[in-house]
């Protein structure tokens, strides 16, 4: 099980609010926030706003891709990919170039993913069943 704090933006205060609402892991966050009704309930129980809950659920969803993790999920999000649905529709070579440019501008990761890694992410996204409903 993955700690909530591995998601960028979830620090001790937000993690405490989520735990008080019954969410202790990234996996539990994804399960609870997979539907609009689930996110609304989570917002009410945690007293955290809709935009943050949705952002974190999307990151949790991206973290299902093997090799993405907390570091690369931030890079993907900054490059304009914040859902698995969006990732599955990307051309790996174009996405790789966008990741390079994003990292040059924002210095988010020390080591960029390889083109082979990005190809693998896109392929995984194409076969993973959808979890988040919008």
Q: Model-predicted segments: where are they?
A:
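C-terminal extensions
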Residues: 1-134
